Amino acid sequence: MDGKTILPCSEVPEEFTWDLSDVFASDDKWSEELEALKAYPERMAAYAGKLGESAKTLLDWFTLSDEITVRVSKFVQYASCRSDQDVGNSFYQGMRSKAFSMSVALNSAGSFEASEIMAIPDETLARFYAEEPKLETYRRSIDKLRRRKAHILSPECEKILAAAGEISESPDRTFSMFHNADMRYPDVTDAKGEVHTLTDGTFVPMLMSADRTLRENAFKAYYKRAGEFRNTYASTLDAQFKQLKFFADARHYNSTLEASLDVTEVPVEVYTNLIDAVHGNLDKMYRYVELRKKILGVDELHMYDVYTPIVADADVEISFEEAKKTALEALAVLGRDYTDVLEEAFSNRWLDVYENTGKRGGAYCTGNGWPHPYVLLNHKDNLDSMFTLVHEMGHAMHTWHSCKYQPVNTAEYVIFVAEVASTCNEILLMRHLLGKTDDRKQRAYLINHFLDQFKGTLYRQTMFAEFELQMGKMAESGEALTADALSAKYLALNKLYFGDTMISDDEIALEWTRIPHFYYNYYVFQYATSFSAAVAIANRILREGESAVRDYKKFLSGGCSKEPVELLRDMGVDMRTPAPVNDALSLFGELIDELSALLG
């Protein structure tokens, strides 16, 4: 099989699909677990009002919580993976719904935890630690809860908010079902008149084509179709930010941004400093756009011209087998123990590889490492897909290390550091590929791809982050997120970030309709901060070798054992300053100069 053929999910060869039997042997076993999990709320209720009674009671509660965490994580993981393999399958969608309902029910059953732990006097808690040394394992979790004391409500209110958790997932679920399962796009033709199937999964690969007619036709057809449903898309985003505002207000935060970042202990200034730093380096982006226009030799550079490789004849087809081999070579610098786990993942079907009819688009790694993570891909046999592979395996290795070396309560790393490991893998792959060739055209092609990573990850994700911030402010001021308002704001940002050399086509005003991360609660800025941190970390690994690798594996194994900014500081990267962003964008400028010299 290759990345060009789109089959029904039932016809995809087994070797390219997940082996979910590592989690549950069958759907029936999953159903048995559903019944078993129903016993937990009663067991949890027995601890209500008692967490401050004794050290033993508190330890017993945390032990039970760990047990539930592992079982529920596996339970949700299995159902989510099943439903994402075929989003149109009503049985698996029902399974997913049951899984999330159970997760919400258990969260609700344990909602008294935060307020009760908050209420334990400092001197009593100190005595508990002295009486029961095993409680030290949970000190970090306890400290995180008590840090947010001003935002934790009464047990009754916490139970209501926990029960509302399922409702808060509705905008994301509705968008995902509509966008992935229900949306259909017209076929498009290339310069030769050949017909191509346009899907959400084939859209970007078409924009990467050297055929400008195909790029333009795909671009216009995709957004024409999206425009027909722009009010539906706007409605789901409006609901998303209204639910964020509801929870932020309920917990007495000043903004939806503050509420979202506080959960992961990231200072708000990290977010705003990123936007300011990128604004201060937009001149480099404008230089990149001008160079792209010059090399492509077009009178006007349009938004459908931003993905196609500048050195078109250097574009190569990379099979999944070749992508795996190259990934192992590039990441060998991280040690044999690292690549051994990668090989295990490849051999034991931790990955669902190719796009198929009804499969969820994009790529992701599940956040559960018990027994191991799973990775979803939509591999297209190109360079971008190879980078996606190492990116998602970076997530997988981060999850695997944290779940292996951290206790359950500190195994789940926060989003802010999640993208560092994945992006570091991408940087190491790029350095590996550049180190293998002196060919001017091949180097130019790779550097162009590297520059596109800067554009797509640092600049583009910061633009998304700024758009999210604008949506949050709209919701906070009571302004409705209408399709017209969103499109106007998005088009203005696109013009700011790409500059006057780029034609910001009217269609691009609707790009917000296709971005799933806008439903992830201020997630995307972390791609940009992580990219900046990853550049610094990868450079240190390549420069210092074993000592840096040793520190890096401590980072991978750190889970949430420290605040995320502190985990990065241990690697020598301080994201509370603009230095990492400025340094990364300085490299961007140097790469522009090198590409310009290579291509004359």
What is the predicted role of each segment?
Residues 252, 380-400, 422, 427, ...:
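Active-site recognition of the HExxH zinc-binding catalytic motif
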Residues 10-14, 25, 113, 117, ...:
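C-terminal, non-catalytic "cap/extension" segments appended to globular domains
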Residues 316-320, 368-390:
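Short pre-active-site segment immediately N-terminal to the catalytic Zn-binding motif
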Residues 295-339, 374-375, 398, 445, ...:
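Long, K/E/R/D-enriched contiguous segments that form extended
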Residues 329, 333-340, 366, 395, ...:
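Conserved helix-loop functional segments at active or binding sites
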Residues 316-318, 351-371:
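Catalytic zinc-binding patch centered on the HExxH motif and its immediate surroundings
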Residues 1-50, 70, 74-269, 273, ...:
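His/Asp/Glu-rich acidic catalytic environments and adjacent acidic regulatory segments
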Residues 413-442, 450-452, 456, 530:
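Post-HExxH zinc-binding segment in Zn-dependent metallohydrolases
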